[in-house]
UniProtKB/Swiss-Prot annotation:
Pfam families on file: SUI1
Gene Ontology biological process terms from the UniProt entry: formation of translation preinitiation complex; regulation of translation; translation reinitiation
Molecular function, one GO term: mRNA binding
Lineage: superkingdom: Archaea
InterPro entries according to UniProt: DENR/SUI1_TIF, SUI1, SUI1_arc, SUI1_arc_bac, SUI1_dom_sf
Keyword Transcription regulation: no
Stored CDD domains: YciH_like (cd11567)
Name of the protein this chain belongs to: Protein translation factor SUI1 homolog
Protein keywords: Protein biosynthesis, Translation regulation
Similarity comment: Belongs to the SUI1 family.
Length: 101
């Protein structure tokens, strides 16, 4: 049985990740990359509290696009701002703290 390093409870009973999701201020915006392609950037997620690789994998499958996680931010190919907000809100992030630019 794994023990949470933050609260000391077993991983099954740990609520640290849920609390971290509600508190974080997430920014979602698009930028133009090479050849005029759009990339959706998701930043402001603390890597220590939330598994950013697993979150990237979930967002890529829900948005049906390619992407990666680099330097503490998630990059998705295409314009997926609204879909990302819906998915993050469904995963427990507070929709008030998700800022779309």
């Amino acid at each position: 049985m794994k023990i949470c390093e933050i609260c000391g409870l077993p991983k099954d009973l740990c609520v640290c990740e849920e609390i971290a999701r509600e508190v974080q201020k997430v920014k979602v915006y698009t930028v133009r990359r090479r050849f005029g392609k759009l990339m959706t950037i998701v930043e402001g997620i603390d890597e220590h509290d939330i598994d950013i690789r697993e979150l990237t994998k979930t967002l890529k499958s829900k948005c049906a696009c390619g992407g990666t996680s680099k330097k503490g931010q998630i990059e998705l190919q295409g314009d997926h701002k609204r879909k990302v907000k819906e998915v993050l809100a469904g995963m427990g992030f507070s929709s008030d703290t998700i800022e779309i630019k």
